[in-house]
From Swiss-Prot:
Involved in protein export. Acts as a chaperone by maintaining the newly synthesized protein in an open conformation. Functions as a peptidyl-prolyl cis-trans isomerase. GO terms for biological process: 'de novo' cotranslational protein folding; cell division; chaperone-mediated protein folding; protein transport; protein unfolding. This is Trigger factor. Belongs to the FKBP-type PPIase family. Tig subfamily. Consists of 3 domains; the N-terminus binds the ribosome, the middle domain has PPIase activity, while the C-terminus has intrinsic chaperone activity on its own. Keywords: Cell cycle, Cell division, Chaperone, Cytoplasm, Isomerase, Rotamase. The keyword Cell division applies. It holds the Pfam family Trigger_N. Its EC number is 5.2.1.8. It comes from Verminephrobacter eiseniae (strain EF01-2). Its main location: cytoplasm. GO terms for cellular component: cytoplasm.
């Protein structure tokens, strides 16, 4: 087999493969003889069809299959021998004017780039930490009590205040005209907890049962309802009922309702601590990994294979269509998703994948079996039957590949932190679990 490799662009290569015709033909003949032993044709007994007839019927298809396989095998062998790390599938075409006795093909493909990362010792990265305090346990316990609160109707002349459940009728108009979803009857919400806009809550706060009020409400320009985004509506609201909240007492009944085995508040607080510590580990892992990702993106130099980017664009679009379909949109593929809308995300994903892959390869950071086991056991610990969950994880190959990848990313994160300029910052549990910036 004769092979030549030519550089076409930074990452694009052309490999010319020349295979002996005899190699192809011998494989074709062998397959046709094998087919002749079992093929069925009208006018012939099974296994008695002449080779010439079998060749006329199936020869072209068999030759195409053999050529495809042989060229693919030859390409893989040649790429490995040349130490080429191929990105994506090659585009293979047969060339004209080939040498006598040989068939020649050109394979156009891309290779993975060299990844150059700046000296990590000069890279500054923030690393977050936190710890569970008695105050964070108190706040969580208060939240659990609120989930189990009851409401009782307040006196007719009592004004609505934060924490009250209010039932209202409302109607909004823009320039005197009603708009979609701008009207409701017997709508109930809790003041201070959404989902109503702050201006709406401010208007209702202080009103009494039976009172009505008209007030303006300016919708933000980024409001999800495009019909009203950036416009000001006049709302008429009537309060029909006000209810005050009553939290359950902190005692044995509450503890047992929340799953405390012994019914003690001490046991409940211990359970809350354990849950918070598990959530903290997960959130810190994600936040610190993201900080490392951003630092590597800013300090790595590499070319992106076009094929990899196009594959990622296709994957993102397929995921978007699947999400729309799950939300009840019929035939979501008819909705055009412009490529330029997903390209930045696709390029970022490919860049990160290449950087992490190179870090794992260059520094031996592939997930070890014991690390994977510890990660799986941590995931399973929150379930009622952890051992069954562990077996379930190990029985799901796709899920295990995701876990192995996640553990490898954790290894990269720790590797980078060990070598970079780390700026340590301690934050509260609430800041970690309920960040103001949704990107966190």
């Amino acid at each position: 087999m004769a092979v030549t490799v030519e550089t076409l662009d930074k990452l694009e290569r052309k490999m010319t493969l020349s295979l002996p015709v005899t190699l192809i033909q011998s494989e074709v003949d062998m397959r046709l003889r094998r087919m002749a032993r079992t093929v069925k044709m009208d006018g012939f007994r099974p296994g008695k069809v002449p080779m010439a007839v079998v060749a006329r019927r199936y020869g072209d298809a068999v030759q195409y299959e053999v050529l495809t396989n042989k060229v693919g095998e030859a390409f893989t062998v040649a790429a490995n021998e040349a130490n080429l790390r191929v990105a994506g599938r090659p585009r293979i075409t047969e060339t004209q004017g080939t040498a006598e006795g040989h068939v020649t093909f050109d394979a156009i493909f891309e290779v993975f780039p060299e990844v150059r990362i700046a000296d990590l010792a000069n890279v500054e990265i923030e690393k977050l930490s936190t710890e569970v305090t008695e105050a964070s346990i108190d706040k969580t316990l208060q939240g659990l009590r609120k989930q189990r609160r009851s409401f009782a109707q307040r006196a007719h002349d009592a004004p609505a205040q934060d924490g009250d459940g209010v039932t209202v009728d409302f109607e909004g108009k823009i320039d005197g005209e009603p708009f979609a979803n701008g009207k409701a009857e017997n709508f109930r919400f809790v003041i201070g907890e959404g989902p109503m806009p702050k201006e709406f809550e401010d208007a209702v706060r202080g009103m009494k049962s039976g009172e009505s009020k008209t007030f303006p409400l300016a919708f933000p320009t980024q409001y999800h309802g495009q019909e009203v985004a950036g416009k000001t509506a006049d709302f008429l609201v009537t309060v029909k009922k006000i209810e005050s909240a009553h939290l359950p007492e902190v005692g044995e009944a509450l503890a047992r309702s929340l799953g405390s085995a012994d019914g003690s508040i001490e046991g409940l607080r211990a359970d809350i601590r354990k849950t918070l510590e598990r959530e903290i580990r997960s959130h810190l892992r994600a936040r610190n990994r993201r900080a490392v990702m951003n630092a590597l993106l800013a300090n790595a130099d590499l070319e992106l294979p076009k094929a990899s980017v196009q594959d990622e664009i296709a994957r993102l679009k397929a995921n978007a269509y699947a999400d729309l379909k799950q939300r009840g949109v019929k035939d979501p593929e008819r909705l055009e998703i412009p490529e330029d809308k997903v390209r930045p995300t696709a390029e970022r994903n490919v860049r990160l994948r290449l950087i992490f892959s190179e870090m794992v390869r260059a520094h031996g950071l592939r997930a070890k079996p014991e690390q994977v086991r510890a990660y799986v056991e941590e995931l399973a610990a929150s379930y009622e039957k952890p051992a069954e969950m562990v077996r379930g994880y190990y029985g799901d190959r796709r899920r295990m590949l995701e876990i192995e990848s996640s553990v490898s990313e954790d290894n990269v994160t720790e590797f980078v932190f060990a070598r970079a300029k780390v700026v340590a910052r301690t934050i509260s549990v609430d800041e970690l679990l309920n960040p103001k910036d949704p990107k966190d």
